[in-house]
Design a protein with these regions (language model features):
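Short, active-site-adjacent cap segments at secondary-structure transitions
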Residues: 21-23, 108, 144
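Extended substrate/RNA-proximal surfaces in nucleic-acid metabolism proteins
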Residues: 1-103, 158-164
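Long, positively charged, glycine-interspersed low-complexity recognition regions
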Residues: 146, 163-166
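Histidine/acidic-residue-rich catalytic or RNA/ligand-binding cores of hydrolases
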Residues: 84-92, 111-127, 144-158
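Acidic carboxylate-rich catalytic motifs and surrounding loops in phosphoryl-/glycosyl-chemistry enzymes
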Residues: 18, 139-142, 167
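Short acidic/histidine-rich active-site segments
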Residues: 133-147
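His/Asp/Glu-enriched short active-site or ligand-binding loop at hydrolase and phosphoryl-transfer sites
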Residues: 100-113
């Protein structure tokens, strides 16, 4: 309930955000504009519980359209091989729409649910560097012990000599 949360708590300005699901190949997201207006940041993502993985063309069109939404801030884990994407088109759209791309530490966990994430991030990150698209690291912690754990993401950024100015 946004009405009971103060905008500043113990001297810290609070930011509000959520992860949005792309629910169709037209790029529709699953939160009303009324709620989106109250958020500081949003991450838009493809999840196979919300949308059956489609063709590269279908998935890419959905992402490109979602990135045009003025309430979207970040594209979440575009590295999931279950949803093939035209990575160059996606990175260009992120640049054109002033969006960040998430580098998700959990995606890089061996045996995780996202397939070929490491290989796909090795394609996405150089494109981000080339087009000067900022990335944001996220632990994507689903349990307290993983909060703030960016070890795999940091190692990949270092391996690729990714510019710190874009992180």
């Amino acid at each position: 309930n946004f009405n009971v949360i103060p905008p500043v708590l113990e001297g810290v300005r609070l930011l509000f955000g959520c992860e949005l699901n792309i629910v169709d190949y037209s790029g529709t997201i699953d939160l009303s504009e009324r709620m989106l207006k109250r958020l500081s940041y949003t991450v838009v993502s493809l999840h196979d519980l919300c949308l059956k993985p489609g063709t590269m063309e279908d998935n890419t069109f959905a992402v490109l359209t979602a990135l045009k939404n003025p309430y979207v801030t970040i594209l979440g884990h575009p590295d999931d091989g279950k949803f093939p994407l035209d990575y160059e088109a996606v990175v260009k759209a992120a640049k054109d729409n002033h969006r960040m791309i998430e580098l998700n530490n959990t995606s890089l966990t061996p045996g995780g649910s996202r397939i070929h994430a490491y290989e796909n991030d090795r394609i996405i990150l150089p494109l981000c560097a080339s087009y000067k698209v900022p990335v944001i690291m996220n632990s994507d912690a689903h349990f307290t012990t993983s909060v703030g754990d960016h070890a795999r993401a940091e190692a990949l950024l270092k391996e690729l000599n990714f510019p710190e100015t874009l992180i």
